[in-house]
Amino acid sequence: VTAVGSFGYFISPIFTNYSLIEYGWNYTLFLFSLFLVTGLIAAFFVRSPKDNEIIENRSDQSLKEALSEALESKSYILLISGFFVCGFHITLVGTHVPKYVMDRGLEDWTAAAILALIGLFNIFGSLLSGYLSTKISKKFLLSVIYLLRGFSIAFFIFTPPSVLSAFIFGASFGFLWLSTVPATSGIVAHLFGTKFLGLLYGIVFLSHQIGSFFG
């Protein structure tokens, strides 16, 4: 699901840059509104499995007990903290890189290309992360992803500005963009089961969005 969503992120910067230049922001916003309506219509056709017991733990644990167990877990708190940093990274790059690129003397299309590359390579990064999550330690995988993100950002900041370095950054950071999601959700499911996975992962994702706000 994450990989497919990234395809939209790949198309969006290219389409937006072209539409803003050719038709202006009014028409561009109208088209994005149509895309949003299409997504809302599709959501009405999503159906839950007929037998929820297939995907839930057979447990009599209450919601209060699940929350208490999670919030007392050091691993869960660290996961929340890590996803805060993830959200900070995501918005920092998505919001400030376009202006940063132009401030360093590159043309504005370079920023759109970076964002498009992020979306494109995130398709492969998310798929690989999901696969590796079933083969190696999810905690180790998540640590490596965050470490490589730091290297990718440092490379972009400290290397001389060029189209090549911008493209390398877009591809490398895109590969790591949302590759944290499969490992993170997998860790939550491994620690606490799937009965309250939606809520417990939702809390982790809330931390991600708070990090995005500060980014």
Task: Give residue spans per PLM region.
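Transmembrane alpha-helical cores of Major Facilitator Superfamily
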Residues: 3-7, 84, 116-120, 147, ...
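Helix-loop-helix hairpin linking two adjacent transmembrane segments in secondary transporters
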Residues: 4-51
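Flexible cytoplasmic inter-helical loops of multi-pass small-molecule transporters
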Residues: 47-65
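Extracytoplasmic gate region of multi-pass secondary transporters
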Residues: 13, 71-131, 215
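Cytoplasmic helix-loop-helix junction between adjacent transmembrane helices
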Residues: 1-4, 187, 193
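Small-residue-rich segments within alpha-helical transmembrane domains of MFS-like 12-TM solute carriers
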Residues: 10, 87, 91, 174-182, ...
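C-terminal transmembrane helical hairpin of 12-TM major facilitator-type secondary transporters
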Residues: 116-122, 128, 133-187
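A late C-terminal transmembrane helix in Major Facilitator Superfamily
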Residues: 9, 178, 191-215
